[in-house]
Structure formats: structure tokens, C-alpha cells
Amino acid sequence: MKKINILACMLLMAAATTVFCTSCENDNINPYDYVNNGGNGNENQGSKDVIKTNVAEYPVGSMVWTKDTTLSESVEIPVGTSLYIEPGVTVTCKSEVQVPVEIVVLGNLYCLGTAQKPVTFTSDTKKPEDWGGIICGFESEEVVLNHVDIAYGGATPTESSLSYQHRLFKPGKIDGGVPAFHFCNVNGKFVMANSFFHDNYNDQTYFTGGNGVIINNIFADSGNAADGGEAINVKAGCKLDVANNVIYNACTNAFKLSNAGNSEVIPLTEMAAYNNTIVNCGWRRSKNKKGGSVWVEKAAKPVFVNNLIYDSRYGLKQPKQDGADMEHSRLTPNYYFASTETGVEQMAKGASLGIWFDSDIKSTVAGQLNPLFKSFKQSDKMNVNCEVDDVAQGAPLAFDKTWNFDFQEGSPALSGGVTDFARLFPNGLPFFGMKKVNFLDTQNDQNY
């Protein structure tokens, strides 16, 4: 059985998708042609034969996209069908459409690039809110996102949107834009690894169920001043390992952790979040008190340790009522740095709604305990309370992929962490849809 090896922080996979083709190189990239050249009575059910491309052979029941494609309407991956997207494919979503483009995954998605050839989801105008996102269904069993760039999503759905019709995201109502990636099957599983989520108008991710590993990703420049936006928004029904991610400029929170939605069939969430780097988060308008860096509510009980919070609006926070399950959580030690006196005050002991631990490492004066990133430029006008998405008024600079958030030699952040905690998936997660792929190109036959 092939598994994601999170112990070694290696999450590599490959997948592919185009139109159904029988044992031949697939030249057709029409994403709406669910059958081989259409009309064989197999609509929306995947191929009846093995699909062979230059990269791999894919099992019966597959869709395979091998080349770049442009979407002008939403695509639905049916239950029981697996969509594979091969390395290097770019999916461009058109923005000038009546109903925002969504990719609704009722079946499985294996969207796996490589470091040299990432899979890219973008838009034609490259502006936030140009399209919706990847929205998964209640029967979606497996999703793999490896070396994937996802940008410019977050559009608000309409009643004609697939996500609304399938009652997938906030069922039965329209409440702002959809996340760039949403997973909801309590019994399903997903992995997000080595990927770059950026410039999405609302939440980068939103989880209401599922077993997942989120590792080695960058989440940058999410949300908007009017509606906010989290990088990682977790409700009840999840089991998650979240590690080694960089979260930059999340408008509201890097993490919003909650057990909202818990029921007889939706269990309380279990989560281990560790070794994450959180920078410049929480600048959104002050009328929403949840803006900050990490918000824990409704009996959430995460393991949240060894994380670095850098120049974010607040420290760890919870509401006055219905906050974290403090008895069953582990929320310390973490490392908090502030380069301004305002930042120091807003994460200090006694700060409104703050959760304080003496075992945390915190700046007590501006600039103290600088973790010394290898390469990072902070805005000269940086203001943790700016409340407007304007660099001139103190909002964060746009993310620069040349920045390096590893620590320099001698950094005070190189010590003080702990190792006496457990991951949820110490041996990784198996993805059976990948086990069925026979790679023909050794450069793309990835270890997972």
C-alpha cells in the first residue's frame, strides 16, 4: 500500500486528467467532454477502458487532463469518477461569466504536479474573486493536491452554482464567496503538499470533515477587508496534521479552529498543528473581534505547538463564551514576535480575549527575540491595526516567493520547541487511486 510519508515531510504524487480516451495519447482537452468524443451513453461516469498517455496508464473510471485548458463554466467530477491532472497543466478560469466557474468534485481528484512542473489553477484576468474554487462533495473519497498553485478564487456563488445545487458549502444559503479548497466528507481523505495558495478573495481552505495532511505549503494574501478570510478554517468532523506551512497575510486569521457542526454523525475534530510560520496576519477591520492570528472556539481541542507568530495583530485568542476546550487542548509552547510596541501590547498577558501561557516565548519589547529569517522584507509602514488593504496605510506587502522563512544561524527561534506530542497520521495516509496508476515516465513516477 502506498502512503504519504509525513514523517519525512515528503509528499509527492502525480495525477492526470483530460477527456476519456481508450489506450491512446489523449489530445482532447475539452473538460466538458465526459466521454470519448461524446455520446456513448457513459456521460459523467469516467472511462470504460484504461487511459494511456505519455506519462502513465490510468484505471477504468478515470478522466485525464494532459494539457492546458480554459474553463468558461463549472466542471463536475461525478461520484465514482477520478479526475487526474498531469504535471505542468494550467487550468484557466474565465471571469466574465454569468455563474462563477467552480470545480465540484463529487468523486476523486488527483491534481499532482512536480517541483519543476506544478499544476496551476488561475484566471484570465488574474484578480481575486475571478472564479470560485475546488469544492468537494460529501462522497468525495480522495483528493491529492501536490505542487499545485491555486489563485484568484473566492467568487460568490449563485443559486445556479454547482456548489449551491449540491448543498456543499454552507448548505442552503449564500454567505459570501467560496473557499479556494473545501472538503467535507468525514470519511474521506485529502493531502495538500508543496502547494501555493495565493490571492484568493475569501478563505484559502475550509474543512467541515475529512482526514487530511497539510504540509509544506504557502498560503499568502488571502481574504479582503470587507469580509475577511482565513488561511485554514476548520470545523467539526476532521482529523488533521498541519505542519511546516508558511501563512502570510491572512486577512483575519491564519487558523480559525472550531467544533461547530458537531453532531451524532459528525465527530469532534482532532488536530495537530506544529512548526508553522505565521506572518503579518489579522489586519482586517476591528469590528470583527476574531481578527488576529489564531482563533479557537466552540470546544476546539487542537494540539498547537512549535508555531511562530510574527508581527500579527494579536496572539492566540478565544471568545468570552464557548471558547477552546482548555482541558483537552495543548496550546503551548509557541513563539510570538512583534516588531512594534502595539504588537507587543496586543499579545501581552491580559490582552482582551487572549490566551496566555508562561511557557510561550514572546517579545516583551518591540523587536525583542527577532527570529532572523534568512530572507524577508517587512513593510516600512507595517501597522498590525491597519484595517484596510492598502500598503501605504500599513497593510502587508504582496508576498514575494524569493523570501526564505528558514532561520539564520544563531536565531533564538531554533530552540524552545517540544517533541512530546503525537501526530494523527504518523505513517501517512494511503491514496488508493494513486496505487492504480502505472507511471511510464520515470521523471513523473513520484514517491508517495
Model regions and ranges:
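Bacterial N-terminal signal peptides that target proteins for export
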Residues: 1-11
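Generic N-terminal leader segments that precede the first folded domain
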Residues: 10-11, 24-27
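Low-complexity, intrinsically disordered short peptide segments enriched in small/polar/basic residues
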Residues: 1-3, 16, 434-437
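Processing junctions and N-termini across compartments
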Residues: 15-18, 59
